[in-house]
A protein has these predicted regions:
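Short, contiguous, helix-prone interaction/anchoring segments in small proteins
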Residues: 41-48
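Short, compositionally biased strand/turn segments
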Residues: 7, 20, 58-72
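A short secondary-structure junction motif
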Residues: 51-66, 92-99
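Intrinsically disordered, low-complexity, charged terminal extensions of DNA damage-control enzymes
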Residues: 1-41
Length: 180
């Protein structure tokens, strides 16, 4: 079994120190925040993946509100329980029809033993991304975020995330958005 270096308090500090040495803009941000920056993390497995799908192309506040309402409907937050909820309830909670279809499809794949999210923990990053993006509703952003937030992989980064691109633009004082 491959052993991966995972995000924890020690590796977060190492990463901050590395960034502060390499990039003055990061150093300034880290010092302004007194290095008190919480990592982006989610629960591993079904709940984390569904949370990321809800977040696709939404503001953080909107996504959190919708997912909070979904968690009231789905107790416990399992694929089986998810599938037992009338899809109209998810629509009332603010989830789009398309995302309801994506989430239901993922839940069904898990219930039918066609998707094993636990097995992803032991796979290389590229393999995890490859397997996830084969699933309807999951693109590179979601797969990269799953690696970073749910599996806590250190070298995962959702490079196409508009919020991160704009933050880098501001930090570097760039006129134009950087490309990836």
């Amino acid at each position: 079994m491959t052993k991966f270096k995972l995000l924890n308090e020690e590796t977060l500090k190492e990463g901050f120190d590395f960034l502060a040495k390499k990039e003055p803009g990061f150093k300034k941000v880290l010092e302004e925040k007194n290095y008190a920056i919480n990592p982006f993390t989610k629960k591993e497995g079904f709940e984390g993946l569904i949370s990321l799908i809800v977040e696709q192309q939404l503001s953080v506040a909107s996504a959190q509100a919708i997912f909070g309402r979904m968690k009231i409907l789905v107790k416990p937050f399992t694929p089986e329980k998810f599938l037992s909820v009338n899809p109209e309830k998810f629509k009332e909670a603010g989830l789009s029809k398309q995302k309801i279809d994506y989430c239901s499809g993922i839940a069904k794949k898990i219930v039918d033993n066609e998707l094993d999210l636990k097995a992803l923990k032991n796979k290389e990053d590229a393999q995890v991304i490859k397997e996830l993006i084969e699933i309807r509703g999951i693109g590179e952003w979601t797969a990269q975020c799953y690696l970073m937030a749910c599996l806590k992989r250190l070298d995962a980064w959702p490079y196409s995330d508009l919020g991160l691109i704009v933050a880098a633009q501001r930090m570097k004082g760039l006129k134009d958005r950087p490309d990836y």
